Swiss-Prot record:
InterPro entries xrefs: TACC_fungi (IPR024312)
UniProt feature coiled coil, ranges: 310-821
Pfam families (UniProt xref): Fungal_TACC (PF12709)
Natural source organism: Saccharomyces cerevisiae (strain ATCC 204508 / S288c)
Name the UniProt record assigns to this protein: Kinetochore protein SLK19
Residues bearing PTM Phosphothreonine: 7, 273
Reported modifications of this chain: Cleaved by ESP1 at the onset of anaphase.
Comp. bias (Polar residues): 15-51
Impact after mutating residue 77 to E: No cleavage by ESP1
One Gene Ontology CC term in the entry: spindle midzone
Keyword set includes Cell cycle: yes
Gene3D superfamilies on file: 1.10.287.1490
Any one Gene Ontology BP term: cell division
Length: 821
């Protein structure tokens, strides 16, 4: 693939028809026994023409034709054919004829021996990707001198290869001037494409490009035919040399040779230079003229074959250029499709990533919303249980409060009874005071009336006993009231333990004050009881001692008066205590009313909580509906995503199919190029073999015809031309490698430009998609955020209420614990 073999030939347009006719006429004049081997010795292989041999003119005409000798051997000397070919040489070429192996031979010429190029054999050649020129240094040096002669006899065309990727060459040649101007154009060689390795690629096909190469060319058979032809030719030459003395045998041998040449020339398909023929019919008298004629005939044949090879080379270079152009277009299409596929793939992956991210976000938000809803449900359940507990506690507190009110009313009635009893006692005490005063008067007036005093003392004793009984009854009543107070205290503690949520600190303080006053009263009652006991003892002592002394009685009366004063003080203190109890009772009633108002407020709060519960349930249902809507939207988005993924898969399949087709086409083109290169190698090998054979034959001809000097000059020229062609081949190889490097650089730059364009377009698409999705879901997210904020605020309010209630309960529990201590 790196080195492309070339077939160096000279592009010739035109046939040397006139010189061929002149040479034939001259040979007929010099040798009356001329033969018609020239018109009949044509190559019958299709798609080729005969090599035109430039005849060597006689000595008397050499001076007139020296200007022709200075020119190159590939110069066309037929003006008629040059004019025909200069019009448009490519239009005169028929590819089907060139590759048709079954085409019959062209017809023979007239008896005079004039042969046209249409009657001559065509040489079939393999494809050559490069159009080259066998340049003549003499022709270039004499270019300005021979312009007029070229206009007369046919212009010499130097057409080189020009394979450019940018444009298709204009192969039509309008005039001889354009052909002359295009001589020095150097065209670039076709490029090798390094994208696909034929050894690695699994798909290898052969494109049927309209030419069946396997049918038209068989390399192995051609080589075998060439070897057989060379051997037969050598045998014939040996046979002719051995029989050169017999003239009759010469004529027969030459006729046999002519027939055999007509049969052999079919195998001379791929030879660029024919074998030199020696004539056995020459006699000793015309041997020199015969050799000159054979040399000229061979030169004409070579000239025609060079011309045909050049034409075929030109056609093949054009075909290879078109194939390279098609291959480059297919490569560019394939690259564009691959870039489009990469773009679609990247867009598809980005869409998948975006949708996955959005789905993940929606799923996380959905999970967070579900967790929040579950928390709200749990909170609502807790609030419901707390509300139920509060309702039950409220009922219990209400019942206990009613019971405590009834107990307070009962205590109030008992207190009124005690007040009445105290008033009666006061009245009794007043009466006693009056009686004591009377007794003092009686004692002072009548000391003799002891018996009366005794009776009065007895009465007093009886009264004291009654008073003691009354005091005992009052003590019993007080004890019962104390028990009732204890019961009330226990009931109050129970109420306080039950009503932990209420703020009863003032009530508890009042109760504590009542308890302290009660304890004081109990102490005082104990003191009174003790005093009563002492008084009883004293009275008994006095009763015992009254008999003895009146003084002691007076002292006792004084003590009784003092005791009466103390009792009055106690009564006044009890009145004060009663007033205090009455004021406390009023405060307790006020507090009870306040508690009732608080209970009503709590009932209102409970109703508000129930309403908030209903509102929360409604919001939960709305959130659940929104969650269902979001799930439905997610399902729709998933369906859309699946549709887009299916579409992308179909596009990927189409792209892969198209890419496979393009790869197949590229592989076919690569294989065609490889086949062309192989054919070029084979043709170059053939050229080398033929050149070697030519050298061998030229040596033989030089040994047989030492008198001919032009053949040696021609050989030297051929050697020089071969060397120049070798240099040109190396130049073409270097140009081919440079062109290949340039195309690779261009392809890399084009790929980078396409990648930059694709990346910019992709970023714009991603930005547009982001904006679209943000605008689509922004309103929904805002609504959900507002709802979440409202719900969080409501929950905070409920938490604050619960925390305040719990603090109140804890304070009540602390107070109860302090009271128990």
């Amino acid at each position: 693939m790196n080195e492309v073999p070339t077939t160096p030939v000279r592009l010739i347009l035109g046939q040397a028809q006139q010189r061929e006719q002149n040479s034939e006429n001259c040979s007929q004049e010099r040798n009356p026994r001329t033969f018609n081997s020239e018109p009949d010795s044509s190559f019958n292989s299709p798609g080729s023409s005969q090599f035109v041999i430039h005849p060597h003119e006689p000595l008397e005409k050499e001076k007139d034709e020296k200007q022709d000798l200075d020119r190159s051997i590939d110069y066309g000397r037929s003006s008629a054919l040059n004019n025909k070919n200069n019009a448009n040489p490519l239009e005169n070429i028929d590819i089907n004829k060139m590759f048709d192996d079954k085409k019959s031979d062209s017809g023979t010429n007239d008896d005079k021996g004039g042969a046209s190029t249409s009657d001559k054999h065509v040489l079939a050649l393999n494809y050559s990707p490069i159009r080259v020129e066998m340049n003549s240094s003499e022709k270039r040096s004499d270019k300005n001198v021979d312009v007029d002669e070229n206009d007369k006899e046919g212009s010499h065309i130097n057409k080189k290869l020009k394979l450019q990727l940018e444009s298709v060459p204009d192969l039509k040649q309008s005039s001889t001037k354009d052909i002359i101007n295009d001589k020095e154009e150097i065209m670039s060689s076709p490029m090798a494409i390094d994208m696909i390795e034929t050894n690695i690629s699994p798909n290898k096909f052969i494109i049927n490009d309209g030419v069946e190469r396997n049918d038209s060319f068989n390399i192995n058979t051609d080589t075998l035919k060439l070897e057989n032809d060379i051997n037969e030719k050598q045998q014939e030459e040996d046979f002719i040399k051995s029989n050169s003395n017999n003239v009759v045998n010469i004529d027969n041998a030459y006729k046999e040779k002519e027939d055999e040449e007509n049969d052999i020339t079919n195998s001379h398909i791929n030879r660029l230079t024919p074998l030199y023929e020696t004539s056995a019919r020459e006699s000793n008298s015309n041997e020199e003229g015969r050799n000159d004629y054979d040399d000229d005939n061979q030169l004409d044949i070579r000239h025609d074959n060079f011309q045909i090879v050049a034409k075929r080379n030109e056609e093949l270079t054009d075909q290879i250029y078109h194939l390279n152009q098609m291959l480059n277009s297919l490569i560019s299409k394939n690259e564009s499709l691959s870039f489009q596929y990469e773009k679609l793939n990247k867009n598809h992956q980005l869409l998948i990533d975006l949708t996955n991210e959005k789905l993940d976000k929606l799923n996380t938000e959905r999970e967070s919303d579900i967790a929040k809803v579950e928390k709200f449900k749990k909170r609502i359940k807790e609030l419901n249980t707390e509300i139920k507990v509060l309702n039950s506690n409220q009922k219990i507190l209400q019942e206990k409060f009613d019971a405590s009110i009834t107990e307070v009313n009962h205590i109030k009635g008992e207190h009124e009874n005690t007040v009445n009893t105290l008033q009666q006692n006061e009245k009794i005490l007043n009466d006693k005071n009056v009686e004591l005063e009377n007794m003092k008067a009686e004692l002072k007036g009548n000391n003799d009336k002891l018996s009366e005093y005794e009776t009065t003392l007895n009465d007093l004793n009886s009264r004291i006993v009654q008073l003691n009984d009354k005091i005992e009854s009052t003590d019993i009543v007080l004890k019962s009231k104390e028990n009732e107070l204890d019961n009330l205290k226990l009931s109050l503690k129970e109420t306080l333990s039950i009503s932990k949520d209420f703020n009863d600190s003032d009530l508890i303080g009042q109760i504590n004050e009542l308890i302290s006053t009660k304890n004081n009263l109990q102490q005082k009652m104990d003191d009174l009881n003790n005093l009563n006991d002492d008084n009883l003892k004293v009275v008994q002592d006095k009763l015992i001692k009254n008999e003895e002394t009146l003084k002691l009685k007076e002292a006792e009366i004084d003590s009784l008066n003092s005791e009466m004063d103390e009792l009055k003080k106690q009564i006044t203190s009890k009145d004060d205590e009663f007033k205090m109890w009455q004021s406390k009772y009023e405060t307790v009633e006020d507090e009870a009313k306040i508690r009732n108002a608080e209970v009503t407020e709590l009932n209102g709060d409970i109703e508000d909580l129930k309403e908030s519960k209903l509102h929360l349930e409604e919001t939960i249902t709305e959130l659940e509906n929104k969650v269902h809507k979001l799930e439905n939207e997610c399902e729709l988005e998933k369906q859309k995503f699946e549709k887009t993924s299916l579409e992308l898969e179909s596009l990927q399949l189409k792209n892969s199919n198209i890419q496979a087709e393009h790869i197949k086409e590229l592989e076919n083109l690569h294989e065609n190029l490889i086949s062309l290169q192989n054919e070029l190698k084979i043709s170059s090998d053939r050229i080398t073999t033929l050149t070697k054979e030519n050298e061998v034959l030229m040596e033989q001809n030089n040994n047989n015809n030492n008198s001919v000097t032009l053949s040696n000059d021609q050989k030297d020229r051929d050697d020089e031309k071969i060397k120049s062609l070798g240099k040109q081949v190396q130049d073409w190889k270097e140009k081919y490698e440079a062109k290949e490097k340039d195309t690779n650089k261009r392809l890399k730059l084009l790929a980078e430009d396409l990648y930059i364009q694709y990346s910019s377009k992709h970023e714009q698409k991603v930005k547009l998609l982001k904006k679209g999705y943000e605008n689509k879901y922004q309103n929904k997210f805002d609504q959900l955020n507002l709802e979440n904020k409202t719900l969080s605020e409501e929950i905070e309010q409920l938490n604050k209420q619960l925390s305040s209630e719990r603090e109140e309960k804890q304070e009540l529990l602390k107070l109860l614990e302090n009271e128990k201590k």
